[in-house]
């Protein structure tokens, strides 16, 4: 019984987003071609992506709408924001049409840059502003905002020239739209000297100079144009779009790394069996389980896991802890939340979200509230909770890796040793992960429940969508830290597992050879070999022949049991057997520590490069997670962590974090999942 192919939707969708991000060169803006969160993220993060405003598709309706507004305004029609005041002042009337629009922009340029205060970030990043300019432009293509085509062309030119205004970080309640942030885009278009524009990454000049440099002149706003520019959800939706691109990629990354965790922890793959999820058919649960089942299918580490649980199996837990065993059930609502949020944000991206909506075909202006960003605001809260859920799962799994009683044979703190009194492995990361998780859980608290009435009680409910999107972006940055730490730890665990296998072979070879040399009976030899395989190697690696550590204790106990059970065996007297066992112990002390130390030192020096010298890496070579291991160890040039190594954990985790933040991590992700949906290899930037 297997999974239905149709259930692979979210994996397919996310891989599609990654490919779209990589491949897009031009974003068509025409009011009919959908713009996705991947397109928005690509424009925000890649300077080679251009915007193409398609006149053939939308110019006629834009100009018809603009002409209708101008005609009605000149005729003295009573239309909100055209011949009336704004918000709570809509009872006021005026025929000073252009002055009214410029007055609106002037009063909304009320943000403050808090340079010198903590936190130091006091402005929205250029990525958010460029994305907002794109979404405002797209909103106008529906032909119901009343703005001139020339203003839209100017926005297109500014985007393609990489010119955008500096915008204060705070000040928007996202209803009536993102008024204050959007006023800075309007301020750039009208050439307000107080508005500072960025040109590229380094140049900052006043708005009039920025316009001049790209061959534009300041606009004198006509009726409704100022209101159309500021009265929308574009900033909240812009940030939400890049947030959703990242959330999708990180979701798939966490899901995939759950499989890698199963391998290194010696988890049982049974938790992903299709029948378990068929009888509880939540879509996200089925999809996550299907992915994990495929990732673990034919895993070479599962062979080691089955061997591990076959020894003293009645003394070992029958099932894995929740962080692995219930991961599909835990991920189920997170998958669904992120999927639904993506759909919602993309709906907002492809919408006209201002007021009033001009229905020129029926000769009317419809006064509504498409500027209300509650759909974005609420879903940003939901996504932040989902992100906290992903972080909690990582924290639980990471904790299992750090504790020797839970990690099925791995050393505490994932310390390579051998002297654990001076090697604390990844203990610092363990502490940091607790800090990250705590902050992430705090950020999961909702923003949208903290609404205050604004603007003279006219905006008595508002969405806080931009604030919520910003906080979700912040949460994602913490999740990236947690993923970087967890992936670093799992690569360390892979190294330790492979060293463990090599060391066990050394112990078995030495025990077998010495048993033969000392003339021990076959059943005695078998008992000793059983102990050599059963005792976790990291419990005695620091001093293999210490009589107080588990290996020698186990071997002695086995010998004692043999002597008690057998007074004679194959003609050997008990006294003779005791003498031979004593000789075995003496020779063991002479040989075992030296041979184990030689293997450990070689691995510590060369790590994954020992594959050139032996078959220590045979397990990871056959794993679907090899692309991640190679990427971290080879592409990022990290190494096995030990007390003798000069580098600190921070240096390695920083490299992994940077690769997540700039999107390089999607390279091994795509390679890892290549066979799941037949996706081609690729690369990506900007997670």
From Swiss-Prot:
PTM comment: Contains an active site 4-methylidene-imidazol-5-one (MIO), which is formed autocatalytically by cyclization and dehydration of residues Ala-Ser-Gly.
pH note: Optimum pH is 7.5-8.0.
Entry keyword annotation includes Transferase: no
Cross-link type 5-imidazolinone (Ala-Gly), residue numbers: 175-177
Quaternary structure note: Homodimer. Homotetramer, dimer of dimers.
Family membership: Belongs to the PAL/histidase family.
Primary location group: cytoplasm
Outcome, altering residue 322 to X: Abolishes enzyme activity
EC number: 5.4.3.10, 4.3.1.24
UniProt name for this protein: Phenylalanine aminomutase (L-beta-phenylalanine forming)
Subcellular location: Cytoplasm
Mutation effect (residue 371 to X): Abolishes enzyme activity
InterPro entries listed in its UniProt record: Aromatic_Lyase (IPR001106), Fumarase/histidase_N (IPR024083), L-Aspartase-like (IPR008948), Phe/His_NH3-lyase_AS (IPR022313), Phe_NH3-lyase (IPR005922), Phe_NH3-lyase_shielding_dom_sf (IPR023144), Taxol_Phe_23mut (IPR031008)
A GO CC term assigned to this protein in UniProt: cytoplasm
Pathway listed: Alkaloid biosynthesis; taxol biosynthesis; Phenylpropanoid metabolism; trans-cinnamate biosynthesis; trans-cinnamate from L-phenylalanine: step 1/1
Keyword Protein biosynthesis assigned: no
